[in-house]
């Protein structure tokens, strides 16, 4: 989903994708050493249709990140690098630019092809909406629960939360101290990747079968400390024919659970797709709107909105 998110944002910004190579989530681990990404840079450098190369990865092993960056520095084409979960990205260099998140990476890539920034809708954060949500939530509703199909989407939202909160946990957190001890029980701010082996061993992927996510949505809705539940909905071939529609009844039930307990509950959705996907992007977003779900315009904004909704004692 990292490469899909990057390609969708490039499409939205008016750019195009000559080649998209999925390296796999473990490629930049110490064990594999970035073999696929290094090969991909070689191939794309030799490809006449490719003018700019963008690299995206879940948190890489530091030694492997250095190896990939060393290769990128000698590439004859401009390279944009987005290694999620890194601390402050390094300063841009000649021919090598760094991005903190997927939206910034897509923007830097399209600007390098000559597209003008002034011509683009950058979808800035909706601060009046953030103020509204903060005013609705009770003082004890201070936690985010992220229920994701896409691993990189989960990572990006989780790292946005980590910039402001210390008590952030996940089943895919590389730091053992922040990894959930029991994936069936959330603690504080919890971000779950339902596509990870923890949940898919012997079961269909959540992009196809929403069963696991539905039961967890209802579980999280019963927690009075939860202010916002975040979910992604991935479009494309091989995904569910109606990824939002299949969750609507569960969303309504979650809202009813909170209402019966006399408290609000914000559900934040993000539909990853384009107007050219087999499922209708506009229709999927409309289903969310009709169900009273706030929807975000990008993976980056999803993480930022969720984080800001539950910030206490701050003014937007």
Regions found by a protein language model. Name each.
Residues 1-316:
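Catalytic-core regions of core metabolic enzymes
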């Amino acid at each position: 989903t990292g490469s899909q998110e990057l390609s969708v944002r490039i499409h939205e910004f008016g750019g195009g994708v000559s080649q998209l190579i999925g390296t796999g989530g473990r490629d930049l681990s110490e064990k594999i050493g970035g073999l696929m990404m290094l090969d991909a840079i070689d191939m794309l450098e030799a490809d006449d249709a490719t003018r700019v190369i963008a690299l995206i990865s879940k948190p890489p092993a530091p030694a492997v990140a250095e190896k990939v960056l060393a290769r990128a520095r000698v590439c004859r084409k401009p390279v944009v690098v987005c290694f999620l979960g890194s601390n402050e990205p390094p300063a841009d260099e000649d021919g090598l630019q760094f991005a903190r998140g997927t939206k910034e990476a897509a923007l830097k890539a399209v600007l390098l092809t000559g597209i003008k920034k002034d011509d683009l809708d950058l979808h800035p954060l909706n601060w009046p909406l953030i103020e509204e949500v903060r005013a609705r939530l009770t003082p004890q509703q201070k936690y985010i629960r992220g229920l994701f199909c896409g691993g990189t989407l989960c990572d990006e939202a989780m790292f946005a939360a980590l910039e402001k909160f210390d008590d952030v946990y996940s089943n895919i957190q590389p730091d053992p101290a922040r990894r959930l001890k029991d994936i069936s029980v959330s603690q504080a701010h919890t971000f779950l990747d339902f596509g990870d082996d923890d949940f898919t061993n012997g079961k269909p992927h959540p992009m196809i079968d929403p069963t696991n996510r539905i039961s967890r949505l209802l579980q999280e809705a019963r927690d009075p400390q939860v202010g916002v539940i975040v979910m992604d909905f991935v479009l494309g071939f091989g995904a569910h024919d109606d990824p939002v529609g299949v969750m609507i009844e569960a969303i309504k039930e979650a809202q009813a659970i909170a209402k019966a307990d006399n408290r609000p509950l914000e559900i934040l959705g993000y539909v990853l797709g384009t107007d050219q996907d087999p499922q209708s992007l506009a229709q999927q977003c409309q289903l969310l709107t009709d169900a009273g779900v706030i929807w975000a315009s990008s993976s980056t904004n999803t993480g930022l909105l969720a984080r800001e909704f539950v910030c206490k004692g701050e003014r937007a």
